[in-house]
Amino acid sequence: MTDGVRLATPRGRALLAATALGSGMAFLDSTVVNVALPTIGRELDASLAALQWTVNAYTLTLAALILLGGSLGDRLGRRRIYLVGVVWFTAASVLCALAPTAEVLIAARALQGIGGALLTPGALAILQTTMHPDDRPRAIGTWAGLTGVSGVLGPLLGGWLLEYDWRWVFAINVPLAVVTVWLIVVSAPESRDEQASGKFDVSGAALGAVALGASTYALISWPEDGASALNVGMAVLSVAAAAGFLYRERTAAHPMVPLSLFSDRTFSGINLMTFAVYAGLSGVMFFIVIQLQVTLGWSPLEAGIATIPTTILMLLFSGKSADLAKRFGIRPPLVVGSLCGAAGVVLLVAVGDGDNYLTDVLPGVTLLGIGLTTLVPTLTATVMASAPQHLAGVASGVNNGVARAAGLLAVAALPAIAGLSGAAYEDPELLTDAYRIAMGVCAGLLAVGAVAAMTLRPRALTEPPTTAPAAELHEHEAAAPAPCSAPGLPPSHGS
């Protein structure tokens, strides 16, 4: 199997299904809970801050540990760590389903994020190191599309499950995990980086986690408590920890994030774009389902169904969008996709003036779907093509950490920017005012993604990454518990 597994073979299809299904669970849980937030708030008597933490506790640990997941896979075996992640994620999902209070649910969501951090980078790294080179771009593009579909499908599935009980939103992961484990065992060979060496960068990981956690706390608490001593202290702590993290990664013998990885212009640019796009997308998915339910009075299922056009478009066409990048280069699909998505969000700003799905909601979600279908597969494939193959897990972990941290900070910051706090989200008029401000910001973030894409060096996906930084990267291979807050530090898809 020196040339890799062919996508057209039964084993290749099983491998793609196993990686898409497992990582899809993690992406699904990034969005499925959004549609359940109003119901969870009522049944567990949760404030807006508690609902934000229900989303962000998961994203926080996912972003904080996702680089560790990539490094562990590169060292101990990508299939092994992927399987551990699936099992851990499933066990935490059961705890979420049984949670009697908002506090217990938040804690279980944090545990769930740990499992997601182990399985998410492993899925992409398994494809990158196992698939035949000729099939790799298409396999990764299809994986990205299917994973994106799972994230967008979250509100629909969540709405349907809420017809029975919100706890099924988490319990549904159990049968999915059983299928995933079976598929990965029968289809994926074990792989690892035999040259990996060095100690885990525990200090770097701790500094990154503190930076992201402290900034998230300050952003969520500020609308209600203002410039309290605790909030100001957390803000200062986050800045100091972020500075300490960057210094540590520059000077450590074995950094968790080799900063020389960012010396590749494409890798740096695509991660900047990832941050902007996933921040915008996470904000859209957080606000749209609440707006549809609270302001328009739609049921959770109706709010979930509203996103179906986006799901259908990604399911039908994501597998082919990577072919566009091979033919025209990476910039056109990335720029066009970001601008289409931004235009779709602009149309969704008007939701609330009327409740006609065909005229008020459908145009926006359709245009957003076209943008994501064009953008996401090319973005993912570009990340992996711009890094040395033996650092596939680290590159995947960095990009996923950027995406998750972006979503984390967006969900924490947007309510504050829009002036929404406490129980104000239950007031349709106050919510609509905040919704429009937040969606305008999200559209702007997607437009920033297009600008970032324009700075990328034109290249086809078949071109190898520059080799200059590769040797240096190998010398400083990342192998530490992941940070969280590095990229400016934030997906999700869209997460």
Label each residue range with its predicted role.
Residues R136, V174-D193, A209-S221, L237-A252, ...:
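C-terminal membrane-cytosol helix-exit motif in multi-pass small-molecule transporters
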Residues E43-D45, G77, L98-V104, L162-D165, ...:
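Helix-breaking motifs and short loop linkers at transmembrane-helix boundaries and internal kinks
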